[in-house]
Amino acid sequence: VTGAQGEGVARREPGMFCLVLHSHLPWLANHGRWPVGEEWLYQSWAATYLPVTSVLRRLADEGRTRLLTLGITPVLAAQLDDPHCLDGMHHWLGNWQLRAHEAAGMPSPALRELGALEHRASAAALEDFETRWRHGGSAVLRQLIDAETIELLGGPLAHPFQPLLDPRLRAFSLTEGLADARARWGHTPSGIWAPECGFTPGMERGYADAGVSHFMVDGPALRGDTSVGRPVWDSDVVAFGRDLEVSYRVWSPRTGYPGHAAYRDFHTYDHDTGLKPARVTGRSVPAEKKAPYDPALAAVALDKHVDDFVETVRRRLRSESARTGRDALVVAAFDTELFGHWWYEGPQWLEKVLRALPAAGIEIGTLADARARGYVGEPVELQDSSWGSGKDWRVWAGDQVQDLVQLNAEVVQTALDTIDKSRDANPEQPELRNRVHDQMLRETLMTVSSDWAFMVSKDSAAGYARDRAHKHAHALREIADAVASGRGDVARRLAEGWNAADGLFPALDARRLPGREAGTTGPTAVSAGSK
C-alpha cells in the first residue's frame, strides 16, 4: 500500500501531490535555557517531533509508504542524539507532567480541565520518549526511512546560507552534512533542503559533485511555474518549487489555518503553570480576554480545514494539468515545527490530510517519486533566490545584518588562511588528522549559521543571535591566533575546550576541506567515512 492507496478511493485525480517538511533548529545545547535556548528545542521536541513521528509510525503500521519528504538538518539531528539534550528533554517532559498535575488542582474549572488534558498528553509523551527516544532520535527516524514511509532530505552542516559562503566551505559543509546523514541513518540522501532555499548560479555543479539529484526552491524562483521540477542550467540536478497557492492556504506571512478562532493560542500563557489555556478567539483580542481552549471546537475547525486543503489540492492539480496539457505536480512545503509547536492541532491535521488525500483519489508521493515518474520539465536558468522576505537575499545580506555578513567573511577567511598555511608548510607530507583544524571549521560553520541573520532581520531574539555568532567567531579567532603565533600546545588546549563545550559533529575532518584550486581536495584525499 503506497501513499496513493487507501480505503474508499475516489476517481483518480490528475498528477501528484508532494508534501515536504523541513525540520531545523540551530544548535541550542548549553547555550542558554529561557527565553531562548534549550527551552526552544524541548518545546519543539515535545510539540512537534514526538507527535509527528507518531503520526508517521501509525500510518506506516498500516502499510502506507512514501507519504512525504522530510528534511532533517544535521544540526537538529545532532541534538536529537545528544546525551545532554536527551537528559534535558526527559527532565522537561517530567516537569510538563508536574505542571499539568498542578493545573488539575487549580480552583478555576477551565484550568482544571486543561490540566487533565495536559496530564494525559504529557504522560503519553513521556511513555513515547522513554520507549523509543531515550537513546536518541536516529533509531526512530531510521525506522521510517527503512520502511520507505518518508524520503529523507539532507543538508549542509550547521545550516549556512550557501550563496554567501566561500565555495570551498560550501562544498565541505555539504559533503560533511551528507556523510553525517549516512552515519546516523545508514542512508545518503539523494535530495537536500537547501538552507533557506538559498541559491546562486553555480551551486548546481556543487550539488552534482556531491551526488545530489534534487533540491527545493521557492515557487517564485521558478517564475511561479511549479507544475514540474526543472533541471538547473546545464546540469541534471532538478529544482522542485514550492507551490505558494497551496502552501499559503495552510500558512503564509499574513494568514492560514492556525489563526482560526477555535485553535489553541500560541502566545497566551498561564504564568503559574506555563500552560497555554486560551484559544485564538480573534486576531485583535487581547490575551486577558481570550476564551478558554475547547478541544471540541478545535476538532470541528480541523475537519473543515482538512476538507478545504484536499479541495485546494484537487483544484490546483486539475487547473495546472489543464494549463500545461500534462499531469501536474503540486508541492506544498513547510517548516516541520509549524505542526505542533506553532500550531497545536497541526499533527492531527497532518494525519487526517495524509489519509484524506488518497481517499479523494489524489496520488501522494515524495520528491524522489516525482523525479522518477517524470515530473520534470525543461531546464531553467535559476537565478539568485531564497524563500525569505522578498524571495531574495535581503534577510541574510541586507543592511540590518551587514555586521554579521562582514563577521562571517572575516571568520571564513581566517579559518581558510590558517589551514592553508599549515598545509603549505608541509606540502610533501600526508595530511594527518588535525583536531585544531577540525575545531576551527566547527566554529566557523557555527558562526555562519543562517539562523543568526534571520533572527536579527526579524528582530526575534536578535541579541541572542548576535551573541551566538560572536561567541563562535571569538572561539575561531582565539584558536587561529594561537596557531599563527606558533603556540601549538595552546591551540590544542583551546580546541579541546571549545569542542567540549558543544561536542558537535565529532566525525568532521578538516582533511576533506577542498584545497585552494578549484576541483582539488587537500594534500591527502580522505573519504567522508574516515574517522
Language-model features: locations:
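Active-site and substrate-binding clefts of carbohydrate-active enzymes
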Residues: 8-65, 72-116, 120, 226-531
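Acidic (Asp/Glu)-rich catalytic clusters
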Residues: 10-13, 57-64, 136-153, 182-185, ...
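Short, solvent-exposed turn/loop segments enriched in Gly/Ser/Thr/Pro and often Arg
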Residues: 71-76, 156-158, 191-200, 367-372
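Glycine-rich phosphate-binding "P-loop"
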Residues: 154-176, 180
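CE4/NodB-like, metal-dependent polysaccharide N-deacetylase domain
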Residues: 170-194, 312-333
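Conserved short loop/turn motifs at secondary-structure junctions
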Residues: 188-199, 335-339, 461
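Hydrophobic, small-residue-rich alpha-helical packing segments that form membrane-like cores
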Residues: 203-212
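His/Asp/Glu-enriched short active-site or ligand-binding loop at hydrolase and phosphoryl-transfer sites
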Residues: 213-224, 363-366
